[in-house]
Amino acid sequence: MSTISDFNTAAQAGIDREHEVQLSLLRTLCQAIREQRSTSEVAQLLGHFSDYCEAHFVSEELIMRQHSFEEYEDHADDHCHLMDLLRVIATDWETADSSSLKASTDEALAFIENHISTRDKRFADFLHRAE
């Protein structure tokens, strides 16, 4: 029979893998933009990354709510901010605003790396203590 500790450990490992996938997808998107790949390829990568983030954020926020994580609102606000950045990237791509596009992709990458190393780490530590 599984325990809450087993669930927490599995949830934390799953979330960590999802963070690795998120970073990989975003780096691939940034590279495609830098290399000025086709509109359809960039649109597909952006859509895939956006969809992945939405699914990840829903699952992560559900676990936070289940555990009454005290930093939930600030953490969820970060998720909203990243989704806003993705909309900016999409607009910059569609309007061919290359200087703004470079700035927005750089900002998104720096933001998610910082988010994972700070907020997500605190959440992982919280889950670990909850075991």
Language-model segments: which ranges?
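Small-residue-biased structural context
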Residues: 1-131
